[in-house]
Swiss-Prot record:
This is Protein RecA. It is found in: Cytoplasm. GO terms for molecular function: ATP binding; ATP hydrolysis activity; ATP-dependent DNA damage sensor activity; damaged DNA binding; single-stranded DNA binding. Keywords: ATP-binding, Cytoplasm, DNA damage, DNA recombination, DNA repair, DNA-binding, Nucleotide-binding, SOS response. Belongs to the RecA family.
Length: 346
C-alpha cells in the first residue's frame, strides 16, 4: 500500500487532471467550499412554505405535485409561476392536457403575456422542448401539466386497441436522466403535475399510484400529495375548497409535514387565510370567540371579515408574514411590495 503522502499526491494529480478535462469544480472536497444556501420560490401559502421546511420550492430541482381531479394541483403550480415571475424570473408552461385557462392564470397573478406556453403533440416533443428550454439557462420555472398526458409517439401512431406496456415509463426515465443535471446547473425548477390511478388487486395498503413509472418518484426532490378536504361556503353558495397538502418526499428538509389552506374559486390560494391560520397557531393573532385581533387591532368578526381586512391592508399582512417567517426561521424577504424569493440558509 502506498504511503499517505504518495496517496495524497496521486489524488491531487488525479483531481487536477479531472478539472483540466471537465472544468473547475468537477470534483471537490465537501469542506473546501461553503455550501450555497438553497434558493426558493414561494408557493403563495405560508402554511405550505413552512411545511416544505425552507420557505418554498427549491430551485434547480424536480418537484412532483399529484392528487385526485380538481384538488388544486394546477393552482399550486400556477402560484409558484406567479411568484417566480414577480421576482423577475422567466416561466414556461407545457400544456400537454391542452387545458390551460389564461384568464384563471391571470387572476392568480401570472403574467400571461410573458409566460412561455407549449401545447405539444407527443410526449417526446414535450420533454424535448422542456430539455431545450432548461439548457438555455434562461428559465426559472417550468410546469409540465400533466405526466399522464405525455403520450408516446408510438401510442399515438398505433391502433386504438394496441398494447404499449412501459412506453411512457421508459420515456420519463430517459428524460429525467438527461434533465436532472441541467436543472441543477441552470437553477430551473421543474414541476411535474401528475394524476392518480388505482392498482388492481391490492388487498393491503393504498391502492393509489401515480402515472409514468417509478423514475419521477426517484428523481423528485419534493413530492406533494394535494387533497380537497372540505367545501367552503358563503351561506349556501360554494366559494372555494379547503385543501390539505402532504409532503410525502423531501430531500431538502424533513418530510411528512402537512399544510392546510383555502383555495377560493376565481382567486386561487388565499394568502390572507393562510396568514390568519398561521398567525393564530404562532400566537401573533388572537382569536376570541369569532373575533380575530392583531396587536390590539380588531381584524374582523369571522375569518372571512378578517381575510378581507388583510386583503385591504397589505402592510399589516406583510408584517404578520414577516414575524411568522422570522419566528420559524424560514426565509423569503417580505417587503411593502410583496413577497420576494430569497436564498434560505440550510
Amino acid at each position: 500500500m502506498a504511503q499517505a503522502p504518495d496517496r495524497e499526491k496521486a489524488l491531487e494529480l488525479a483531481m487536477a487532471q479531472i478539472e483540466k478535462s471537465y472544468g473547475k469544480g468537477s470534483v471537490m472536497r465537501l469542506g473546501d467550499e461553503v455550501r450555497q444556501p438553497i434558493s426558493i420560490i414561494p408557493t403563495g401559502s405560508i402554511a405550505l412554505d413552512v411545511a416544505l421546511g425552507i420557505g418554498g420550492l427549491p430551485r434547480g430541482r424536480v418537484i412532483e405535485i399529484y392528487g385526485p381531479e380538481s384538488s388544486g394541483k394546477t393552482t399550486v403550480a400556477l402560484h409558484a409561476v406567479a411568484n417566480a415571475q414577480a421576482a423577475g424570473g422567466v416561466a414556461a408552461f407545457i400544456d400537454a392536457e391542452h387545458a390551460l385557462d389564461p384568464e384563471y392564470a391571470k387572476k392568480l397573478g401570472v403574467d400571461t403575456d410573458s409566460l412561455l406556453v407549449s401545447q405539444p403533440d407527443t410526449g417526446e416533443q414535450a420533454l424535448e422542448i422542456v430539455d431545450m428550454l432548461i439548457r438555455s439557462g434562461a428559465l426559472d420555472i417550468v410546469v409540465i401539466d400533466s405526466v399522464a398526458a405525455l403520450v408516446p409517439r408510438a401510442e399515438l401512431e398505433g391502433e386504438m386497441g394496441d398494447s404499449h406496456v412501459g412506453l411512457q415509463a421508459r420515456l420519463m426515465s430517459q428524460a429525467l436522466r438527461k434533465m436532472t443535471g441541467a436543472l441543477n446547473n441552470s437553477g430551473t425548477t421543474a414541476i411535474f403535475i401528475n394524476q392518480l390511478r388505482d392498482k388492481i388487486g391490492v388487498m393491503f395498503g393504498s391502492p393509489e399510484t401515480t402515472t409514468g413509472g417509478k423514475a419521477l418518484k426517484f428523481y423528485a426532490s419534493v413530492r406533494m400529495d394535494v387533497r380537497r378536504i372540505e367545501t367552503l361556503k358563503d351561506g349556501t353558495n360554494a366559494v372555494g375548497n379547503r385543501t390539505r397538502v402532504k409532503i410525502v418526499k423531501n430531500k431538502v428538509s424533513p418530510p411528512f409535514k402537512q399544510a392546510e389552506f383555502d383555495i377560493l374559486y376565481g382567486r386561487g390560494i388565499s394568502r390572507e387565510g393562510s396568514l390568519i391560520d398561521m398567525g393564530v397557531d404562532q400566537g401573533f393573532i388572537r382569536k376570541s370567540g369569532a373575533w380575530f385581533t392583531y396587536e390590539g387591532e380588531q381584524l374582523g368578526q369571522g375569518k372571512e371579515n378578517a381575510r378581507n381586512f388583510l386583503l385591504e391592508n397589505g402592510g399589516v399582512a406583510n408584517e404578520i408574514e414577516k414575524k411568522i417567517k422570522e419566528k420559524l426561521g424560514i426565509g423569503a424577504v417580505v417587503t411593502d411590495d410583496g413577497v420576494l424569493p430569497a436564498p434560505v440558509d440550510f
